[in-house]
């Protein structure tokens, strides 16, 4: 039977905790909260999903630079994109198929959590947690299921918490610290999906601006037409008055 731990209960039971982390910005609030609960933390960077390799290294460097200032140990696991492709990459393209996309992410979580759980058991950690649940763009329920599954198989406790309420604060803090903030989850599929979503939003904004310009053009055309009508009306009135004055002048001169 899995002994399930939450942040609220763990205040009375501080543990030696291995915290799987995907990047620096997503670690800020989970680390703050877990330390406040009294846990002894070590970060595990196990993310073979991240592509390309330069992106993987950039995120790791950002995480390590911040963790060093926090006196927080960071363990880097093996970077094995081929293993990730065999496990999660085989699910394939899924940008417009929510079920396949969720299946791909589940396989990705499973691979990384299994690696982290084995590491936690081998190095004598009491429990395993993750920072993935800080993001509102992740599958939180699946994260919880896979974390519990991996921890149970390795004989360590799962410590899950839904950190999404702290996402805005994590965003604010990471920007204030000047941290590198990636614009996609990590894998090559998410990179393409995020790019497509950004392009779609850009197109929507452009269409909105064009519609606004068109609406303003119609308003300007209507205003100009009204002004022209007023000028024509004034010109007709002036001509009529001039004609009256000419008639009166002719009568006076008779």
Spans of features found by a protein language model:
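Nucleotide-activated chemistry modules centered on ATP-dependent adenylation/adenylyltransferase
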Residues: 3-254
């Amino acid at each position: 039977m899995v002994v399930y731990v939450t942040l609220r209960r763990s205040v009375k039971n501080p543990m030696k905790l291995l915290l799987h982390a995907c990047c620096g910005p997503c670690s800020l609030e989970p680390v703050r909260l877990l330390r406040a609960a009294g846990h002894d933390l070590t970060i595990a960077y196990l993310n073979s999903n991240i592509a390309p390799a330069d992106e993987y290294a950039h995120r790791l460097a950002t995480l390590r630079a911040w963790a060093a200032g926090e006196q927080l140990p960071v363990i880097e696991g093996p970077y094995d994109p081929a293993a990730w492709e065999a496990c999660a990459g085989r699910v394939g393209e899924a940008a417009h198929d929510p079920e396949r996309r969720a299946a791909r992410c589940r396989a990705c979580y499973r691979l990384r959590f299994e690696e982290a759980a084995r590491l936690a058991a081998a190095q004598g950690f009491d429990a395993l947690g993750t920072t993935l649940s800080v993001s509102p763009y992740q599958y939180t329920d699946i994260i919880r299921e896979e974390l519990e599954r991996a921890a149970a198989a390795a004989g360590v406790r799962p410590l899950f918490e839904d950190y999404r309420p702290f996402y805005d604060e994590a965003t604010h803090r990471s920007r204030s610290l000047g941290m590198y903030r990636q614009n996609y989850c990590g894998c090559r599929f998410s990179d393409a999906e995020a790019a497509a979503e950004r392009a779609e939003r850009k197109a929507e904004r452009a269409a909105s601006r064009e519609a606004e310009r068109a609406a303003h053009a119609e308003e300007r055309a209507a205003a100009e037409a009204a002004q022209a009508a007023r000028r024509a009306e004034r010109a007709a009135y002036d001509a009529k008055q001039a004609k009256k004055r000419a008639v009166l002048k002719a009568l006076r001169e008779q």
